[in-house]
């Protein structure tokens, strides 16, 4: 199995319950497991190198504190594997633009721009547009057979399969077509009742002092689920 977390901020309880805990439950001595810190994916939204580096350390600590066994798992930072980025370019040349046009994250930004009467390409960089190719490289380079994903991420896995299939057909059978392990969606309420998210600034940090934790909990809107 293979999974990663984008290093764009402070890890929180939602990350643990929705990504870290389920992934660790799937791993074990008999499973070849890959867990990575997706610091190049972070560049799509975060332009401050210091914040990305800080997030790398915090998320690494979160994985280790949650019980990741480095003796039986491969644990790495994405940017430390240059072959991932070499493969990204090779796969980019096999990825159809029409396929990337259908990516949910890209389409959502385009739709928002249109609804705001803005240029549909506003605030869209090539990192966002070609994000599925980098994700495909993350998966295919290790010939991962199974990838745990939430329902909203299943499309990324399908796109990786499409890109791998196109490459295999054009050249030779090289890549395993990975299977999705669809995880039950875990929607953890944040401090304001909305889904816990760094974007909403409503998180309960996973790694913090008791004082900080008490302060965060005291902000919870107690009737937010009513």
Locations of the language-model features?
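N-terminal Rossmann-like or analogous alpha/beta NTP/dinucleotide-binding catalytic cores
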Residues: 1-137
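Active-site cores that bind ATP or allylic diphosphates and position pyrophosphate for catalysis
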Residues: 107-226
């Amino acid at each position: 199995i293979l999974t990663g977390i984008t290093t764009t901020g402070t890890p929180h309880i939602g990350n643990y319950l929705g990504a870290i805990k389920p992934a660790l439950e799937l791993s074990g001595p008999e499973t070849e497991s890959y867990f990575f810190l997706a610091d190049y994916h972070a560049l799509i939204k975060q332009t401050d190198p210091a914040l990305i580096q800080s997030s790398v350390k915090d998320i690494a600590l979160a994985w280790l504190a949650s019980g990741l066994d480095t003796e039986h798992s491969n644990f790495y930072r994405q940017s430390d594997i240059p072959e991932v980025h070499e493969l990204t370019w090779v796969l980019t040349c096999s990825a159809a633009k029409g396929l990337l046009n259908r990516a949910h994250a890209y389409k959502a930004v385009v739709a928002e721009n249109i609804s705001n009467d803005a240029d549909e390409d506003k605030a869209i960089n090539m990192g966002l547009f070609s994000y599925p190719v980098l994700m495909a490289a993350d998966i295919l380079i290790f010939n991962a057979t199974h990838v745990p994903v939430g329902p909203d991420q299943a499309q990324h896995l399908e796109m990786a399969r499409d890109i791998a299939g196109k490459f295999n057909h054009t050249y030779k059978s090289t890549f395993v077509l990975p299977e999705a392990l669809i995880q039950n969606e875990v929607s953890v309420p944040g401090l304001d009742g909305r889904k816990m998210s760094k974007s909403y600034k409503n998180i309960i940090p996973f790694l913090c002092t008791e004082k900080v934790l008490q302060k965060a909990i005291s902000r919870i809107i107690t009737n937010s689920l009513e």
